[in-house]
Amino acid sequence: MSAMRYPGGNFAAGFHWRDGVGPRGDRPAVRELAWQSVEPNTFGTDEFVALCRKMGWMPMLTVNLGTGTPEEARDWVEYCNCPVGTREADRRAANGRSEPHAVKLWCLGNEMDGPWQLGHVPAEHYAIRAQQAAKMMKDCDRTIETVVCGSCTTSLPTWMEWDRQVLEHVGDAADYISLHRYAGNREDDTPDFLAVTAAIDRQIEEVDAACRYVQARRKSARRALLCFDEWNVWYKATGGDGQGKRAPHLIEEVYNLEDALVVAGFLNSFIRHADVVKIANIAQIVNVIAPLLTRGDGLLVQSIFHPFEMMAKRRDGVSLRVAVDGPSYTGRTNGRVPFVDASVILGEGVLHVFLTNRSERAAAPVSIEPADASIAGLESAEILTGPGPKAANSFEHPDVVAARKFDEVSVRAGRARLKLPPLSMAALSLRVG
């Protein structure tokens, strides 16, 4: 991972950053309204930034524009980014951090178009709030970049109209606009579930079209880019009421093979749209709808971890346009898609190819033919598959769905060939000359 977003999420609309700084013994425990739990504030800004530095992540902070104010957001920028000599920077120094945290990415609230959100307001009201916050925050530190709240789901009646109004009002103060999507198979329709990639592609392209429209309408040299700062599979684990407990177990989804293939589809879509999708954050990372589950001191690697890991270690390079020529099918709600989903990254002397076979029954013969290069050999290849679409890992059986070395790739006459098993995902690194 390269960036980490904190503190969320619906949590952000009730979080006041000053509660989470200073000596831990002096920090207040507060009732957290989004998830109906108790927040002890023992982990706050300084702990988060320290964790990011330790892990090599870029910190990304979400200001409270639900129950908070633009001034509170500005003060948080001062606390994090300004040299000592003023009130909030001196507060940071008094808390043991004399050097600025230099946080570059700032989200202007979370899902403010959602009626469930604390402080939800219509688009025109949020746009004023966001514009005020962005101006004050950038006046405090002109190097930061801001993410305005876009439509968090295509199902709300304000879809696209919210984005237009916000972008038109906030203008060039918005560096990015956010998108969210959680995919699910509530109808137990595996082919349609796996075709959700088509809907992800459409969502990205429609929001980008709104950004281009506003850029043209405003006659601006700048255009907001896309920040897909919440995405995942989520539909089996329900209920978000913590019943007033501290650190309750909430929405701990168990993921299976088809979920992992959908996660691969999300990532393929992001790579294909890398010219406009510049930031993407899976939600979450541990326990709550997460690739990793814990039990006591035990750790379970869930199925969705594997495509993320297989692709992350091959992420460096330039996204290439990919054309898939082969059979297709029509999902019940998501539309027509090829059986093979693909994305490609060109690194230094290496071509990284990511392939998913959506078919439940048929293996897919694949020939990889670069337009302006020749494949010289296979550097590495992995495949992810399992005994069936509902196969899942457990603490008792942790490797039911797991990645393994893939030897069935041949290179001949500048092309690579393989046969992709049903319901599988492959990641290849091919030397090119």
Feature roles, as predicted:
Residues M1-G184, E205:
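N-terminal catalytic cores of secreted or lumenal carbohydrate-active enzymes
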Residues D259-I289:
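Substrate-binding cleft of secreted/luminal carbohydrate-active enzymes
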